[in-house]
């Protein structure tokens, strides 16, 4: 446990950051989940709309360091590939 006043303050700040970052990570997962649900339902329009909404959120979290930039790129790439496969299957 923190003994000095500065260590107590840092512990409090770290806990505050941890909970805020957890909230942001949860938000990213929700956006990704919305795209996946639309893909699973084979709803191309809804999937594209959800993907369009998710991309800026994923990028923003990568810029802030909430998720790694490579992880953001991997999510976008895989979701984009699934949507592309869905559109070719529908055509």
Curated annotation (Swiss-Prot):
Protein origin, superkingdom: Bacteria
Chain positions covered by the region annotation Disordered: 1-23
Key words of the record: Ribonucleoprotein, Ribosomal protein, RNA-binding, rRNA-binding
GO cellular component, one term: cytosol
Pfam families: Ribosomal_S20p (PF01649)
GO MF term set: small ribosomal subunit rRNA binding; structural constituent of ribosome
Similarity comment: family membership: Belongs to the bacterial ribosomal protein bS20 family.
Job description of the protein: Binds directly to 16S ribosomal RNA.
Name recorded for this polypeptide: Small ribosomal subunit protein bS20
Organism field: Pseudomonas aeruginosa (strain ATCC 15692 / DSM 22644 / CIP 104116 / JCM 14847 / LMG 12228 / 1C / PRS 101 / PAO1)
């Amino acid at each position: 446990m923190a003994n000095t006043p500065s260590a107590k303050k840092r512990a409090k700040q770290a806990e505050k950051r941890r909970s805020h970052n957890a909230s942001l990570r949860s938000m990213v997962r929700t956006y990704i989940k919305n795209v996946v649900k639309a893909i699973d339902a084979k709803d191309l329009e809804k999937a594209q709309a959800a993907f369009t909404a998710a991309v800026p959120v994923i990028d923003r979290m990568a810029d802030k360091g909430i998720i790694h930039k490579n992880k953001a790129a991997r999510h976008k790439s895989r979701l984009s590939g699934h949507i592309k496969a869905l559109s070719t299957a529908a055509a």
